[in-house]
Amino acid sequence: MITMLIDHIGACVFERGLLLVDEIRNDAALFEMLRNTDRILRLIGRVSFPIFCFLLVEGFLHTHDRKKYALRLFLFALVSEIPFDLAIMGRLFDPVHQNVFFTLLIGLLAMMLCDYFRMQAQPVAQVLVLILAMVLAWALHTDYGYRGVLLIELLYIFRYDRMKQVVAGAVAFSWETTAPVSYTHLTLPTT
């Protein structure tokens, strides 16, 4: 949560605020310092999403009621959308970009369907579910989009092998500079 807060300070306070102020933009040294601070904040914050994906998979595996889990995530996605749009896009509602909880919800629903089709021994249906979930995230313009859904599904597929989760997660999110660091905790021995 702390890394997410750090990321949001960069996105909202710096990118949507300070870096747009004319007086700051006209002072090259100050602008460069604030822009570099923003970059650092955003790099630190990029660790958050992969951790949330891992925790979503763990929650899915351990919850007693997956439907209630999905419903709560859906409600939280809805409640979070207006503050997200105000903070990131500067308007009450913006259909162009949806918050990260919609990505997590799509990933959760995909896990539910893949699990159902796994029990029915229908691997083709599982692949189709993953593809459709990725397309849905892309079409809805969710935060992290299809890549986020893919990451969730990879963590779910390799749920019984931490090292494979680490490798799959780091490779899937290698385009995010600091995101692979998110998986180092998975390599630590458990007691």
What role is predicted for each listed range?
Residues 184-190:
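Conserved small/polar residues in nucleotide/adenosyl-binding loops
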Residues 173-175:
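Short, solvent-exposed aromatic-acidic interface loops
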Residues 178-182:
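Active-site rim beta-loop-alpha module in soluble metabolic enzymes
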